[in-house]
């Protein structure tokens, strides 16, 4: 019986490792050749920046998305870092502009991840909640599959740890730089469940590219 259980554990471990997929996100220009180089090192998905926190599209990030597709990545997504100060356009307008720029460039993405982290957000949580809901509403209206990038600490400061506004139906991209490909240290917030983990960041990766490391 013990031997049988041991065999099951070994099989489960093999299956778990086989189903583990590693990818990356990065900013700055990355050529198709370099994308292929990174892919050959075992990275299977890429998430490129579509929108910058200063309130404009990321032309290099959108080009990276196209280059990742050309390089044959299994999944290619985009992330949206919103502009949140009083000088910024509305959430709706920002998403519309990002959509326009992606279409103009002919760039296709799987999921558009809304980057909700502490950077120039107002202290008014009610206002922040409305802004987040408007981001998601407009993105879904335009046909995007939407996800959320955040952690307990980021979400708590911006919108409140217990709030989700119905957004916990969306996949969560969770940052936690413990260098472990595991969800075991996830601190729950808003009823979300992690789908992807950013397990390390701002490191020198393969092929001379500075990147964040991701896993699911």
Regions found by a protein language model. Name each.
Residues 2-17:
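Cleavable N-terminal signal peptides of Sec/SRP-targeted secreted and luminal proteins
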Residues 10, 52, 202:
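Flexible, active-site-proximal loop/turn residues at the rims of small-molecule/cofactor binding pockets
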Residues 19-144:
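Substrate-binding cleft of extracellular glycoside hydrolase catalytic domains
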Residues 19-28, 163-216:
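Functionally critical loop-and-helix segments that line ligand-binding/catalytic clefts
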Residues 54, 84-86, 154-156, 180, ...:
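Surface-exposed, flexible loop/turn segments at secondary-structure boundaries
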Residues 81, 149-151, 199:
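Conserved beta-strand termini and adjacent loop/short-helix elements that scaffold enzyme active sites
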Residues 110-187:
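Catalytic domains of cell-wall/extracellular-matrix polysaccharide-remodeling enzymes
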């Amino acid at each position: 019986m013990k031997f049988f259980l041991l065999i099951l554990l070994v099989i489960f471990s093999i299956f778990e490792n086989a189903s583990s997929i590693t990818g990356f996100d990065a900013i700055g220009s990355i050529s198709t050749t370099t994308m292929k180089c990174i892919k050959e090192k075992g990275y299977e998905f890429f998430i490129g920046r579509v929108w910058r926190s200063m309130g404009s599209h990321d032309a290099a990030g959108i080009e990276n998305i196209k280059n990742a597709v050309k390089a044959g990545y299994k999944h290619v997504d985009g992330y949206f870092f919103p502009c949140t100060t009083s000088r910024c356009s509305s959430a709706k307008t920002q998403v519309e502009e990002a959509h326009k720029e992606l279409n103009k460039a002919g760039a296709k993405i799987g999921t558009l991840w809304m980057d909700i982290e502490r950077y120039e957000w107002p202290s008014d949580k009610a206002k922040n909640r409305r802004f987040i809901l408007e981001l998601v509403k407009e993105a879904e209206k335009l046909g995007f599959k939407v996800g959320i990038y955040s952690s307990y600490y980021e979400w708590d400061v911006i919108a409140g740890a217990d709030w989700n506004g119905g957004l916990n139906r969306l996949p969560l991209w969770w940052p936690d730089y413990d260098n472990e490909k595991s969800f075991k240290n996830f601190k729950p917030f808003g009823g979300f469940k992690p789908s992807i983990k950013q397990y390390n960041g701002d490191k020198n990766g393969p092929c001379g590219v500075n990147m964040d490391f991701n896993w699911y």
